Amino acid sequence: MNYFSLTSHKKHRGHPSAGPSNAYQNLEKTSVLQETRTFNETPVNPRKCIHILTKILYLINQGEQLVAREATDCFFAMTKLFQSKDVVLRRMVYLGIKELSSIAEDVIIVTSSLTKDMTGKEDLYRAAAIRALCSITDNTMLQAVERYMKQCIVDKNAAVSCAALVSSLRLANTAGDVVKRWANEAQEALNSDNIMVQYHALGLLYHIRKSDRLAVSKLVNKLTRGSLKSPYAVCMLIRIACKLIEEEDIPSEELSDSPLFTFIESCLRHKSEMVIYEAAHAIVNLKNTNPRMLSPAFSILQLFCSSPKATLRFAAVRTLNKVAMTHPAAVTTCNLDLEGLITDSNRSVATLAITTLLKTGAESSVERLMKQISTFVAEISDEFKVVVVQAICALCTKYPRKHTVLMNFLSGMLREEGGLEYKTSIVDTIITIIEENADAKESGLSHLCEFIEDCEHVSLAVRILHLLGKEGPFAATPSKYIRFIYNRVILESPIVRAAAVTAMAQFGASCPALLSNILVLLGRCQMDPDDEVRDRATYYLSILNSERPELYKNYIIERENCSLALLEKSLVEHLNGDVDTRFDISIVPKAAIVKPVIANDVMLVTSSAPRPPKITREEESAARLAQLPGIQVLGPIHRSTAPIQLTESETEYTVQCIKHIFGQHVVFQFDCLNTLSDQILENVRVELTLPEGFTTRAVIPCPKLPYNDLQTTFVIVEFPPDAANSIATFGATLRFVVKDCDPNTGEPESEEGYDDEYMLEDLELTVADQIQKTRKNNFQVSWDAADSEEWLQAEDTFVLSAVTTLQDAVNTIVKILGLGAANLSENVPEGTHLHTLLCSGTFRGGAEILVRAKLALSEGVTLNLTVRSTDQDVAELITAAIG
C-alpha cells in the first residue's frame, strides 16, 4: 500500500463520515515545478520521479497554465530520465512529452531518444514512443523518421502497428502529402489478422484516399468481397459505403441493385452484433429507400428491443427514436416491443421507448404516455430530458388539439432544476407551439411569463421578452403581460432590462389603449444606471411621442435586421471614405434567414465540440470577396447562392459555381478541382457566353491548379439596366494551360504547356438568385402600409397545371421567387381547398417586395398573384416569373 492509500485509509477510519480524499487536490504549481530538480539526481529514483510526473500531469489536466519558460525547463529536466531503464517511469516520460510538446520550446531535442526507443527491441517502449514522437514532429523533420514509421506500420506487434497507424492519421492533417506515401504499408496492414490493426489501417487508407472518389470506390468494392475479419473495420466500411451511396444519390428503384447496398444488407447476417446493428442503423438512415428495403433492418431493431443486453436494447430504441418521424409506418410495427420497454430498469431505454411511442402513437394514447413518463422524468439526465422535449414538440405538430396536456407538462419541466441546454429545448418547443397553433398562444405566453420571473439564464430571458413583444400586443388582453415585462426592468441585469424596454415599446406601438401607460414606464427607464437601457428608452420615447404610425412600423414593429458583419464592413468603408456624407443604412443587406443544419447520422466522424455561431452565406462570402482587387466599387453584397455543380462528379475536372449578387453586378465564383495527378493546370479561367444586355467587367483567373487542390476563379458581370432582362442563361467553358507533371512530386516535367478547354453545363441566373428573403413579423401591417403612392402593384391570375396539390403549389412559388413566407403560410392545412401564401423579400438594389398569392384547388390549382413593390419593373418581373 502506498503512502497516499495509507493516509486515506487512516482518515476513513478516524472519520467514518468523510468521503474519499484526493491526494493531489491542494497542489501548487510552483512547488511541483521545483520538485523537478529531482530529475537531475544520479542515480535516478524511479518511484520518486513517477510521483512528481504524476503531479505535473494532474496539474496540466486540471487546466493549470504553464508559461513557455516553465514548460521548457520542466521538459528539459524530464529528458534526463531517459537514462533510467524503469518501464513505468519511461512510459510516464512519454506522457509528459506529449502534454508539454505544444507549450515547451525546442522539443525536437528528444527526437533521437524517441527514435531509439521506437526502433528498439523493448516492445513496452515502442508503441508509446511512436505516439510521443509524432506529437513533437513537424513537417520539416517528418521525412527523417518516415522510414521508421513505414516499418512500424507493418510491424508484427499489434500495439506498435496500431500506434503507428493512429499517429499517421493524426499527422495526415498537417503533413498529408508525406502520409500519402505510406499507402502501401497501410494496405499491407489491412491484411493483418489483428482486428484493431485492420480497423486503424482502413481508417488511414480512407483518409488518404477520401478526396479521390474513384479510389475510395475501388477500395470499398475490393473490401466488400469479404476480406475483413475485424468487426470494427466492417462497421467503418458500412459507413464509407453509406457515404458513397448518399453522394451518388441513387434513386430507390436502382438502390436495391447497387453492390454497395447489397453489401450493407448482407451485414445484417453477420456474426457480430455490432456489425448487424451498424448495418441496420445505416439502412434506416439512408435516403431513397422503400418499405421492402427497410423491412429487414427494422426486423433486426425489433429483435434487439427484446435482447437481454441493455446496450443492444438502448441502441435499437435510440435508432427507432431517431427515424420515427421519417419512417413512422415502419416504426409503428415495433410499438408492442416499445410498450414493453416503458418499464425497463434502464431509465435511458425507458425514456427513449416512451418518446418514440409519443412520435408514432395514436392521439388517444397521449395522456397515458405522458402520465407514465412523469413518474420518472425527474430521475433521468438532462440529455434524455431533451429527447423527451423533442418528442413532445413533434407530438404538438402532429396532434395540435393536445396542446393543453403537453403545454402543462412542459411548464412543469420548466420549473424543475436543469441546465441551459435543457431549458432552451423546452422554451424552443413552447415557442414553436405558440407560432404554429393560435389556440395555444395565450397559455404558452403565460407559462413563459411565469418562467422569466425566476429565470437564471440571461439568453432565455431575452428571447422570451422578444417573443412577448412580438406576440403579446396581439393577444386577447395585452395589458396582463406588461407587469411581467416591467418586473424585469426592476429586478434583472442590464441586458435583460434593455430587452424589456424594447418589448414594452412594441406594446406601445401596437396597442393605442396602452400607449399612455407605456410612455410613463419608458420615462422611468430613462433614469436607469445602464447606458444601453437609457438610450433605448429615450429612442423609443421619441418615436412614440411623435404619434406617427409610419415611424412605429419602420422602427419598432417591423424592424429590419441588418447583417451585423456586413453592417460593420460598410461602416468601416464609410469611415475610410467621405465621412462628410451621411451613412445610408439602406444599402446594407438584410440579415438572411439561417436555417439549422441537420447533421447526417451516417457520417464517418462526429464531434461533441461546441457549435460555432451560425453565420449567413453572405457574411462568409464577404470576407473572401474582399480580397479581390476593386471589389469595393460594386457596393455591399446582396446575397450569395448555394453552390451548383457544372460538371459530373467523376470527371477529370470538377467545377461548381456560386453566384454573388450585388446591386448592379453579379460575381460568378467558380471552384475548380483537378483530379488528374499527372497534370498541373495554369491560367485557369471560365469564359462565359453572355446574353444580350450583360457586360463582362473583369475575369480573375487562377494562376495554378495542382492535383487535388481546390482553387477559385472569378468573373464579374454587369446586369442590364432593365430588370426584366436580368433572367438569363450563360454558356460556360473552362479554359486553361495543361502541363504534364510527375504524379509523385507534382512538379511539371517541362516549362511548356498547351492550351485546352472543357465544356461546362449552362449557368442560369433566376429571379430567386436576385432576391434576399425576409420574414415579416406582422405581414398584414406591412401589406396595408404598402397601399400607398410609394408602392406599385402588379396582379395576374394563372392556372398551375404542373402541380396537383396546394402544398406543391406553395412550394413551387416559394422556390421560383426565392421569397420568405410569413405567418407560417408556407404550410397548407390538410383538407383545405383554399389557401393564401404571404411572402416578402428584397430585390438587389434595395427594392422591397410583398406578395400575396391566393390559391384555389378544383380540377387544378388556380393562382391569383398580387405583387407590391417599391419598383414597378421588379413587380412586373415577379409576376412574369410565375407565368
UniProtKB/Swiss-Prot annotation:
Oligomeric form and interacting partners: Oligomeric complex that consists of at least the alpha, beta, beta', gamma, delta, epsilon and zeta subunits.
* Ranges for the HEAT repeats: 69-106, 292-329, 331-364, 365-401, 404-439, 476-513
User: What subcellular locations does the record give?
Assistant: Cytoplasm; Golgi apparatus membrane; Cytoplasmic vesicle, COPI-coated vesicle membrane; Endoplasmic reticulum
Keyword DNA repair among record annotations: no
Residues of the region (Disordered) are 1-25
Which biological process terms from the Gene Ontology are attached to this UniProt entry? branch fusion, open tracheal system; chitin-based embryonic cuticle biosynthetic process; endoplasmic reticulum to Golgi vesicle-mediated transport; extracellular matrix organization; intra-Golgi vesicle-mediated transport; intracellular protein transport; larval salivary gland morphogenesis; lumen formation, open tracheal system
Q: Name one GO molecular function term.
A: structural molecule activity
Keywords noted in UniProt: Cytoplasm, Cytoplasmic vesicle, Endoplasmic reticulum, ER-Golgi transport, Golgi apparatus, Membrane, Protein transport, Repeat, Transport
Descriptive protein name: Coatomer subunit gamma
Disrupted-gene phenotype? Narrow tracheal tubes and thin salivary glands with reduced tube diameter and impaired tube elongation. Fails to complete dorsal closure. Fails to efficiently secrete luminal components and assemble the luminal chitinous matrix during tracheal tube expansion. In salivary glands, fails in the luminal deposition and assembly of a distinct, transient intraluminal matrix. Disrupted endoplasmic reticulum and Golgi in embryos. Null mutants die late in embryogenesis with a poorly differentiated cuticle and denticle.
Q: What does this protein do?
A: The coatomer is a cytosolic protein complex that binds to dilysine motifs and reversibly associates with Golgi non-clathrin-coated vesicles, which further mediate biosynthetic protein transport from the ER, via the Golgi up to the trans Golgi network. Coatomer complex is required for budding from Golgi membranes, and is essential for the retrograde Golgi-to-ER transport of dilysine-tagged proteins. Required for limiting lipid storage in lipid droplets. Involved in the expansion of luminal extracellular matrices and apical membrane during tubulogenesis.
How does this chain sit within the bilayer? Peripheral membrane protein
Q: Which GO terms describe its cellular component?
A: acroblast; cis-Golgi network; COPI vesicle coat; endoplasmic reticulum; endoplasmic reticulum-Golgi intermediate compartment; Golgi apparatus; Golgi membrane
> Organism source for this protein?
Drosophila melanogaster (Fruit fly)
Tissue specificity here reads: Expressed in ovary, testis, testis tip, young spermatocytes, germ cells and follicle cells. Up-regulated expression within centrally to posteriorly located germarial cysts and in migrating follicle cells. Widespread expression in imaginal disks including eye-antennal disk, wing disk, third leg and haltere disk.
Which family does the record claim for this protein? Belongs to the COPG family.
